[in-house]
Amino acid sequence: MKTYSAKPSEIEKKWWVIDAKNIVLGRLASRVANMLRGKHKPSFTPHLDCGDNIIIINAEHVKLTGKKANPKDGKIYYRHTGFPGGLKDTTAGKILSSKHPERVIKMAVKRMITRNTLGAKQMSNLYVYANGDHPHMAQQPTVYDFASQNPKNKK
């Protein structure tokens, strides 16, 4: 029996909408990363973008477990400006209470996707919105009920 390898013309992409209200961030990011890669499909092919398009709404209401949401000493995100002594840091709590709370979900998913051009293409299929509105109604997305799959998903 030969290993199945999908062709680009055979790939069908679905649109999913996920409500992130009171959902644990790491569990959500892990599932979304697998769906963006297409690993939930039996026709998964590692070298092709066979994942689906994901819309996440209510990103500002995502939950972090433990002390990670603490704005003072919670989960720390580091970045570097490129200049000497340019290491900057911020916490997940500060990002969630700032102007762009959707960045926490995007960073969590991005760090679970492969770091190459295919991963960048797959990340372009992720749409995250801070509130409950999204402009993708024309694509007729299917609601993905993530909270009811496992009681640990919701907090």
Swiss-Prot record:
Protein task: This protein is one of the early assembly proteins of the 50S ribosomal subunit, although it is not seen to bind rRNA by itself. It is important during the early stages of 50S assembly.
Domain of life according to the entry: Bacteria
Listed GO CC annotations: cytosolic large ribosomal subunit
Cited CDD domains: Ribosomal_L13
Family, as annotated: Belongs to the universal ribosomal protein uL13 family.
Name listed for the protein in its UniProt record: Large ribosomal subunit protein uL13
One GO BP annotation of this record: translation
Keywords noted in UniProt: Ribonucleoprotein, Ribosomal protein
Gene Ontology MF annotations: mRNA binding; structural constituent of ribosome
The UniProt record lists the keyword Ribosomal protein: yes
UniProt organism field: Rickettsia felis (strain ATCC VR-1525 / URRWXCal2) (Rickettsia azadi)
A Pfam family this chain is assigned to: Ribosomal_L13
Subunit details: Part of the 50S ribosomal subunit.
Disulphide bond pairs: none
